[in-house]
């Protein structure tokens, strides 16, 4: 059966699968229901499934929620139908899966990476929003699949099922990597440091959506990702009565303000693009209380890891100086990071040559420019550094609102075309 015929046969099931993931979104490191459902499906298809600390270097995880939050998420997942044994094995902040299928003949190791986490977004309740009309709007407070990872999981399982049904046609080894905590670039490093792609010859990542210019397109590569680092900076001062004893205070809010203004003024870098953004600033408890704590949540980006490191260095200097100016102490905690990445240029024309004849996409450009960051870079860099090849592809979709917006939604036809594309790529490199 061709991959097109397979997707047509499984069309309704794949759409229902995506909608199920959409209804039960789980944010970074809390993907217990999603991961348990995926693992159970992969086991039933005959894959060798490793999960949890089998596929994670625990010391490399970043931005973990508290144990109380994780415990509540585990209990919720079980209440919502997750296999309790699998949830227990996933444990505290170990929601990662690698499924492997080895075929009878020797051949290359081909890997696809799929991200699972949702966003910290409250989904729209507007009547015209398709998940509202269809009854699959998020049922979890302050969590929404607003970046298409629900579709990614459905595509990954669609690929898994297609390959399992046709395993006699392939040679080599297929690895399906289901990664937690892509949002905030927190999860990939721990999987890479556990060695999950050290034997991989071809590494593929993929994203759905992007913008209207790429609707119903398939881009074969990316110009490259920006390196990025996510930091939390906390200033500690001393509270005092703002009217009767202001001289006794150490104003943490002023330290934070000084830092914010100067962080945004960091000089750009001559070797390429650089970014600085303070996304959250929290401080103060009352009108007449001098703030003793200020919290900044910020991110840096750079066209290369070198440029990003420059921005980080300047940021750390500014935060330290702002604290000293206002007689405060401070601490900086890294919550996530990913390096820059370049793709294997020779892969894009080859992928274009096998996707274009399918006739299901309006256009199949060699590459696209996203300007963002993605921790799939860890997987790609490791494979390429060890002599393999890798690329990150785009399934363009006519999204209803920008990524990370409460009204975000994809065209499910594009998701189905994505399964066809992934199956075609897998078949090409596993033959």
Identify the residue ranges that each predicted region occupies:
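Acidic/His- and Gly-rich active-site-bordering loop/insert found
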Residues: 2-145, 158, 169-170
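Divalent metal-coordination and catalytic microenvironments
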Residues: 21, 42, 112, 149, ...
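Metal-dependent amide/peptide-bond hydrolase catalytic core
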Residues: 44, 253-431
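Histidine/acidic-residue-rich, glycine-tolerant segments that coordinate divalent metal ions
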Residues: 63, 97, 119-121, 127-144, ...
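Short Gly/Pro-enriched turn/cap motifs at secondary-structure boundaries
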Residues: 86-91, 182, 221-225, 367-371
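Short coil-to-beta-strand
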Residues: 109-112, 227-234, 292, 389-395
């Amino acid at each position: 059966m061709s991959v097109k015929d397979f997707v047509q046969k499984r069309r309704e099931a794949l759409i229902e699968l995506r909608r199920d993931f959409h209804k039960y979104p789980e944010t970074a490191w809390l993907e217990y229901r999603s991961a348990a459902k995926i693992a159970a499906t992969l086991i039933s298809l005959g894959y060798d499934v490793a999960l949890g600390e089998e596929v994670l270097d625990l010391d490399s995880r970043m931005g973990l929620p508290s144990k109380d939050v994780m415990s509540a998420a585990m209990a919720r997942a079980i209440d919502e139908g997750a296999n309790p044994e699998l949830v227990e094995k996933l444990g505290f902040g170990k929601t990662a899966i690698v499924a492997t299928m080895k075929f009878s003949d020797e051949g290359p190791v081909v890997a696809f990476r799929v991200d699972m986490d949702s966003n910290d977004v409250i989904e729209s309740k507007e009547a015209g929003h398709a998940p509202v009309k269809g009854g699959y709007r998020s049922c979890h407070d302050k969590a929404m699949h607003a970046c298409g990872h629900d579709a990614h999981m459905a595509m990954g399982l669609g690929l898994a099922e297609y390959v399992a049904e046709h395993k006699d046609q392939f040679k080599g080894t297929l690895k399906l990597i289901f990664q937690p905590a892509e949002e905030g670039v927190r999860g990939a490093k721990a999987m890479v440091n556990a060695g999950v792609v050290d034997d991989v010859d071809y590494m593929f990542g993929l994203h759905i959506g992007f913008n209207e210019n790429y609707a119903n397109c398939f881009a074969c590569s990316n110009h490259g990702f920006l390196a990025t680092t996510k930091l939390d900076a906390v200033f500690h001062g001393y509270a005092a009565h703002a009217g009767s004893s202001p001289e006794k205070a150490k104003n943490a809010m002023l330290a934070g303000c000084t830092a914010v203004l100067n962080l945004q003024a960091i000089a750009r870098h001559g070797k390429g693009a650089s970014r600085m953004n303070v996304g959250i600033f929290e401080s103060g408890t009352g009108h007449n209380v001098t703030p003793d704590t200020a919290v900044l949540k910020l991110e840096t980006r750079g066209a290369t890891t070198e440029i990003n490191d420059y921005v980080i260095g300047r940021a750390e200097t500014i935060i330290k100086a702002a604290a000293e100016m206002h007689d405060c102490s401070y601490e900086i905690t890294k919550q996530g990071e990913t390096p820059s990445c370049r793709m294997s240029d020779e892969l894009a024309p080859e992928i274009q040559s096998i996707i274009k004849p399918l006739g299901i996409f309006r256009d199949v450009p060699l590459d696209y420019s996203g300007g963002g960051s993605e921790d799939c870079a860890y997987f790609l860099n490791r494979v390429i550094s060890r002599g393999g090849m890798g690329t990150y592809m785009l399934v363009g979709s006519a999204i209803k609102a920008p990524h990370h917006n409460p009204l975000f939604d994809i065209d499910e036809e594009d998701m189905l075309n994505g399964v066809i594309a992934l199956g075609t790529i897998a078949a090409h490199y596993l033959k």
